[in-house]
Amino acid sequence: MVPTSALPRSPGHPFYAALNKLLAEAKFDAYVEGLCEPLYREGGRPSIPPGVYFRMLFIGYFEGIDSQRGIAWRCSDSLSLRSFLGLKPTESTPDHSSLTIIRQRLPKELIEQVFSFVLTMAFEKKLLKGKSIGVDATTLEANAAMKSIVRREGGGTWKAYLTQLAKEAGIEDPTDDQLRQFDRKRKGKKTSNDDWQSPSDPDARITKMKDGTTGFAYKAEHAVDLDTEIVVAADVKPADQADGETVKDTVVDAQGNLNDATKQECRITEVVADKGYHKTETLVWLGDRGIRTYVAPRRDTRKRRWDDKPEGWQEAHRENQRRTGRDKGKQLQRKRAERVERSFAHVCTTGGARRTWVRGIVEVSKRYLVTVMAHNLGVILRTLIGVGKPREWASMRGFLATCAALWLAILADLVAAGHRVAELASDFADQLLRPRWHFSTSPEAASSTAC
């Protein structure tokens, strides 16, 4: 038997200690436990506290781990992360399967309430303005393979489809190599979402990925406060939906989150987006709600006709074009390109959300929303302590150590130079005080100099 006092302990990571302090001041654990209480049974085996569940998913963002299995491994290996989770030395960390069960049981509406609570934390720290909103989208790689696609009608596989086409082209009983060669050379091939789907994740859509390949994906859309870089709304949508249509739901969600977080003190007055969102119907829809649009216009050499369009469409189009061409519009577009893209870089590239390991648009949305939640906490911490991720803390320590080493080297050089200057000054003073000519008063010297 090993006494508890003999078990290894950790003083904790300074970044996670600051995050725990921030959550404790906002009473985060009490809030999420109150929300989840109706979903827990009174009897039975003690369950995992909701605060521990959310903290483990936060760790996935801060450590750049995309899978729940990897998160569980990382937490079990680190004493500082165990301290962040509030686990005793004798307690084991939750298994990855427990994270899956909890995620499936928690409804998406509850995750959205917790997201609004984090926005309230940002508002209390003066980090939520909600006036100018930048909107953009990116693709998320789905947990589905193109080689397993099936027909929506009938469920036929891609291989069976190719075999039928090969037989129609005169190739009887084609081999796998012949099918691949036939598929590579045939013209007019098209893989449409109307005809094909993934049997493992029917919600995923066939689309072009960031690297130029074709695969199953989802679309993640952010609405970012351009003044503070807080993400006020984030949702996952089918990858084949047009940006001009999904922006309406995103703006509605953003305003609803702001109302919940600020008690209706913040109102969206400006929406900034790239040319992918330029749709006259959407411009009119936003204008009717008192929102000024700064949407980059598409480059269209054709002369547009407005006689067959509803009243007000031409005016909305031209007003948006004039606003975007002014200095303020150009400044907002630069800010959108910088800050909205930065949110995707933090959440997807370094935060582990680019590749999804769960299936179904609802499950992907819940997992992604918690990751964005962690990103907002990182923005708050970056304002309070100067860093928003543990790796930034390590980089800052390295930078400060380098600065300290340089300062000590410079100081040593100055001290050495000071000693050298003192020696030179002393020698110079000696030269000044030493007489240039020596006159002797001895009789011998006097007689020798007499005329």
Features from the language model and the residues they span:
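Secretory-pathway/luminal and periplasmic proteins that interact with or process carbohydrate-rich
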Residues: 80-86
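Anion-binding and metal-coordination hotspots
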Residues: 66-76, 87-451
